[in-house]
Amino acid sequence: MKKLIILTCLFATLSVAASDPPEVSEKVLNAFNKTFVKATEVVWHETQNLFEASFKQSEIISRAIYDGNGNLLRTTRYYSQENLPIHILTKIQKKYAGKSIYGVTELSMDDGVSYHITLQDEKNWYVIESDSWGSLELTKKFKKA
């Protein structure tokens, strides 16, 4: 729960710090509204001719990036272990027994879906990556302060 509060605060801070909202084309808005029908708290940003929507859907904080023609390029979702595919969760629990899942970042692009999972134990933080098949790789390890 603490991780969701932190992510929500970060999301809110970034939203408040944003400048004037960009003019989002009708193509982009239509594409977004068709794909994310139940999105709430939508905030738009424009960078280098790309449009990024930050929003919540089913209580999951998400981002979607579109080009000017309304093509969805990438989505990012931030959530807890409850939304992680069960086969990946089971592999993590087996391989990293004794560590708890702090949060999940899911990246979805044309070439597939990847998961960046932050784990913790009493002494360390761990970042592991998984593909949609559940192949796990430890990418970072940090000592807690």
Regions found by a protein language model. Give the residues of each.
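Sec-dependent N-terminal signal peptides
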Residues: 4-14
